[in-house]
Amino acid sequence: MSVIAITVFIVTYALIASDRVNKTLAALTGAAIVVTLPIINSEDVFYSHETGIDWEVIFLLLSMMIIVSVLRQTGVFEYVAIWTAKRSHGSPLRILLLLVLVMALGSALLDNVTTVLLIAPVTLLVCERLTINAAPFLMAEVFASNIGGAATLVGDPPNIIIASRAGFSFNDFLIHLTPIVIIVTVVLSALLPRLFRGAFAVDPERVADIMSLNEREAIRDRWLLIKCGVVLLLVFVAFIAHPVLHTGPSLVGMLGAGILIVISKLERSDYLSSVKWETLLFFAGLFIMVGALVKTDVVNQLARATTTLTGGHELLTVVLTLGVSTLVSSIIDNIPYVATMTPIVSELVASMPDQSHTDILWWALALGADFGGNLTAVGASANVVMLEIAKSAGTPISFWEFTRKGIAVTVISIALAGIYLWLRYLVMS
């Protein structure tokens, strides 16, 4: 069964990468095959935490899509778009750098998918006003999102899994991972002009038009904006405090979305029209296929085969953990991969001869899984959401267009992460 699961996954992945077949149709077809055979049964699909659909991700996405739909009715995205363009004096590069920094910071404090859903509409409006291609902006922002999400415990779901297994606190992530995230973000910002060379030309007349606009006139419903602001603030506080509240982000998001639906008194079409149902179905199909790989022990065997190559050598173990985490997380969702790897890393930590700085293996796992999401268009949930937003806005980004840029960003990010881990934990310690 493992051979069939691998074959179905590879064929489906190839179809998605070809951009010739609708990726949602490909994912659902692959999912239907592994369920029909049956490699994985309906009980596993709908109820298993290890092999089933990650409902936490699905409902978090749905709730934030609804919140963004309600927020869009206020005109606040137009306001922020005009404000950003004016403060940057219409310079596309300055706008991009500002949005990248906001995205990285936001993804450290919130789930990176949430940050993407909030910032992407602003980006599209800015680019529309300046009549420039939004694709480089969207790609740069999602790169920053995946990098920034590694900085804190709440920034990316794999960090929560690692923290639970290793006993790390919120402050542990701040102390150990935030420094390298800052370094990589700065390097990414410096790399962007070269990575997207020629994407920052703008018509001076469009800049003059932007500078003449009054952003306050963009607000259409101030009272609804105040309501949305209060609800969003409460949602964000609950996101950050969820380790204390023991409440999942999806439940918090759904409560926030439900409250906004009630108090906004909008028509159903106003808040459901912007929900990316196709994206949600794509994730469901992807989770089912990855679940089949987990169920047939493919992911576990891959992880164990990698660890046997290290022979207990500390530096080699770190390099392999970082490298394999990067590669595997670029192909399958990093959540099931990290969930599979944590018990193996725990065994490795216990078997290491030198117990003085074994935490390095956990940080290698976290950085590889988080940074590896930038390698391909399906490497992270935020990537898929951003590509769907771009497609809906009439600025489609192909799988290979994203991946070509993602390879450069990931290679540099992982190289810096490897040097950081080596210097901080194996040399300076």
UniProtKB/Swiss-Prot annotation:
InterPro entries: Arsenical_pump_ArsB, Cit_transptr-like_dom, Diverse_Ion_Transporter. Coiled coil: none annotated. GO terms for cellular component: plasma membrane. The chain crosses the membrane at residues 26-46, 51-71, 99-119, 173-193, 224-244, 279-299, 315-335, 360-380, 407-427. The keyword Transmembrane applies. It comes from the Bacteria. Belongs to the CitM (TC 2.A.11) transporter family. This is 46 kDa membrane protein. It comes from Mycobacterium leprae (strain TN). The gene is ag45.
